[in-house]
Amino acid sequence: MNKDEFLDYHKNCCDYLVDLTRKKNKDYSGNNDNPFFNYESTERLNVTSTEKGFLVRMLDKYNRINSFIEQGVFEVEDEKIEDTLLDLANYSIMMSAYIKHKKNK
């Protein structure tokens, strides 16, 4: 893969994540206009802060990646390592947006 191919791949991943986020946000938040509604549920339930809720989800993904590295396969065959890595990238972007949103309140 050369640099241009990498940049095309990166752009395609980002475009895919925007579309996936739009769909999942609707699934998890319904018609609620708050993109962080689902993540803030950890605070509404007095479990932990929203930021730590993001971290828990990210740790789940890290653990899944670590398991894949150690075992070389996933038991759930319809989810690939690329899906898990993209999920992790998406959680990072969402947490970054949440922190920016909270700072600007």
Model-derived regions: residue spans:
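Intrinsically disordered, low-complexity regulatory regions
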Residues: 1-105
